[in-house]
Amino acid sequence: MFILVVNCGSSSIKADVIDSISQSTLISFSAERIPAAPVLQLNKNNIAYNGEPTVDAILSVGLLSIKEALNDKVISGIGHRVVHGGSEYSQPVLIDDKVEQAIQNLITLAPLHNPINLIGIQKAKEVFPDIPNVAVFDTAF
């Protein structure tokens, strides 16, 4: 089973496809120095990028690159690091409209991170529409 793990920050993005049986990384995407001078890599190889220096645009490129690199492999689930789950979320949760709205409502508690985390969730749903998404909250630890 292959799991996509997404960690969107205010100045960097990391996304890895993990083989849950061997626990090895199959595909690794990273983007650093957003928005100043983005550097994108897939499996440690630079990706030429001349687009907008936004998390939204860069994440689209990253997730589409991952999808292409998967070839015939199928992702079974997507996990998202989310900074703040408030008092409502103390463990991982399947993301639905209610969870997305809760993350939105908690932006005041994590104004630099929760909006970016939501972009990650929304982009993953666009690129991998039929795959379940799970939020894992920093506040659960």
Predicted regions, residues:
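Short glycine-rich, Thr/Ser-proximal phosphate-binding strand/loop in the N-terminal lobe
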Residues: 12-53
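A short acidic Gly-Thr/Ser loop motif
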Residues: 6-11
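Extreme N-terminal starter segment of soluble prokaryotic enzymes
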Residues: 1-4
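Glycine-rich, N-terminal phosphate-binding loop and its surrounding beta-alpha-beta segment
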Residues: 45-81
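Conserved active-site and cofactor/substrate-binding residues in soluble primary-metabolism enzymes
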Residues: 53-57, 94, 98, 115-119
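A generic structural motif
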Residues: 19-27, 71-74, 130-131
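Phosphate-binding/catalytic loop of phosphoryl-transfer enzymes
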Residues: 114-115, 121-141
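Short beta-strand-loop/turn "lid" adjacent to the catalytic site in phosphate-handling enzymes
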Residues: 66-113, 134, 140-141
